[in-house]
Amino acid sequence: NKYKYTDKEMEELISSITILIDTREKVNSHITDYFDKKEIKYKKKALNYGDYSFMIPANEKLGILRDLYFTNSCVIERKASLEEISGNLTKERDRFEKELCLAPKTKVLLIENASYEDIAKGNYDTKYNRKSFIASIHSFWFKYNIPIMFMPNNQYSGLFIREYFEYFLKNYLR
């Protein structure tokens, strides 16, 4: 980075984060309601990868002459349930793998309404074998460098999304 920002300037940049939500993202009012409640800026935009990313609007005072999009550097892929990710790992595996191959280096898979324990105990409504499910989750993590965050209570998904991008940006600017 060319610039060294003061703490005050960093706060200004961080508070200007605008979350980008892919236009194909389904049922996510629990997330947008959180953003609205916390006055977090967001907008819908077609994303090439993932369901969420972010941008920083232009800020001439801080040397940012045009909007900065992080859509090719940092994304979140959200799955609403173990049933949804199970489908991605079985019937839609080829498509899912192609997406992950093309996705940015920094990404995370957010699985809502579930825990690792749910997979281990078979607490999901598909025929996907527990051992295969666990093997696929771990294989994808290492093969595609995609950490997995389980979010048993999806009420915290909005917080996770906002904080993930904030800390990516803080580390990016350091």
Task: Pin down the residues of each PLM region.
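Non-catalytic C-terminal interaction segments of nucleic acid-processing enzymes
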Residues: 1-71, 83-174
